[in-house]
């Protein structure tokens, strides 16, 4: 057999062929570990994830080698094409012979190509294709049997697994008629009888760890990403563009007639103060005020400039808040699965506490939002989310006086609607602690 190792396309194809052989070794090792995984300290889930990661790496290397194979073929054809249209001196004799024999396309005929090389390439390509197809079926029915039994797709791309891959760990447990504590107790008792408690503990630990990390990452994204995007949008796009358009492309100064009226009131106040200063200076100090009109003019221009900046800020803040809401809505839609996981994790974390701690955290959250000291917190919160309005005390007072009332009604409905059905003892403890808190506040007010 001729030495084809120096041909670049054949070298890439051979590399993909060797990786395909390595895939078969990984599958054999997985089947051997699967039979003895419960008798060793290694978890079956870790073996599954390790095998899946190794297979995905092999698939990526195979596709990368096949891509190199196609690129090498393309460059070989390109070099052959350029060689026949601009041949070296040593190839002119061969080109003349090919034209004499009647090859009008000026290319190498197929009978001059080694048939053994073609058969070898076709055999390896067929073997790689069969290996990848068999790997997809094997992953579906052996590596992830639970996903195939439910009739769900493992992934959108059958080989690369780049989208929609379902993990072997179930990250969300739906709430049914029976409480999950009862079903888990039955599962643990069954695992103890079958001597499978260790894999069950590892599974629950992996479930809790994945839920916590996923929930914290999602909450961090909900807090940071909309704020960063809206801030960058305001600083580098909306405010400079709106300021340029407002000052150069249109002649209006005031955004609304109310701003014009306020500016006139300020100018009148400035004139009255200036006249008062002039009268005081002439009557008591005996001095003549110089440049009174210039001072009034400068202060008037400063007042108009401030109103102009307020109008620009209103438009810029409105666009920024719209971008913030769009980004936040996009995160909610794109992270629907993460939202379900976060909901499940929060429920598990809350229901795992004692009744006293549950009532304590409920009181802490309600007092922070609707307690006697909450208006200061709401004033700070409304100053961050302005909804296009410039900071105004009347708007903040209106928000503080209405939104906590609505939130208080919703919280009371949730407490009496859900907690009474799930755990009446929590409601009783909550009422007791709430009465003690109210009694303490009344005594404090009487002493004052």
Curated annotation (Swiss-Prot):
User: In which domain of life is the source organism classified?
Assistant: Eukaryota
How does it sit in the bilayer? Answer: Multi-pass membrane protein
Keyword hit for Cytoplasm: no
GO molecular function per UniProt: antiporter activity
Listed transmembrane segments: 47-67, 213-233, 314-334, 395-415
Tell me the compartments it is located in: Plastid membrane
Which HAMAP family has this protein been placed in?
CemA_PxcA
Family statement drawn from the similarity comment of this UniProt entry: Belongs to the CemA family.
Q: What's this protein's name?
A: Potassium/proton antiporter CemA
Organism of origin: Aneura mirabilis
Supply the gene name.
Answer: cemA
